[in-house]
Amino acid sequence: MPRFEVGMGALWVGGQPLGTKAATETTGPGGSAPLFSTSSDLAGAAGIDGRVGVRLTRALVAEAEASYLTPQLRVAISGDFEGAAAVTATETVQQFTIGGGVLWYLPNGGRARRFAPFAVAGGGYLRQLHDQGTLVDTGRYYQVGGGATYLLASGRHFHTNGIGARVDVRAFFRSKGVAFDGGGHTSPAAGLTAFVRF
């Protein structure tokens, strides 16, 4: 039974709304007058990810993973009290994650040895650089999902025990990091990875 697995591939994380805020001016009687409002979101983006897995049992694998992508941070400004046209400001955010998780191969009754469905869950550290790398936001991420692996070649070939492809879909939850509402945000994510087993 192969014990180690190394994979590298493409990752996509969907957009995440970051909330809305209204800028106001305090008036003399203690009230407030609206100046403008902002609506922010982190756009969906593609990137790369890599992982190393250690098989604990026939069905259970412990994984370490890392990813990098560059989503656009968009801030839309509208409702200016002087009637100025709405405008959207954008900047590129460099997003890094490093963490771990557990993968569980689901029983398939031995119907297809090359095809193996699984469930996966994990989490880790989130780091985001923006404003040309001068500002740093950190947080945590958590994810849960599932997918399948497909063995393209099995048995020993050039010191390996198998080569295959993996596809998965996940719910990606981000806590803190780049955000203007102080809350957590969830978006869909998907990955396609080539892997080698040893």
Annotate each predicted stretch with a short phrase.
Residues V6-M8, P117-G123, G164-R170:
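Extended hydrophobic secondary-structure segments that form protein cores and membrane-embedded regions
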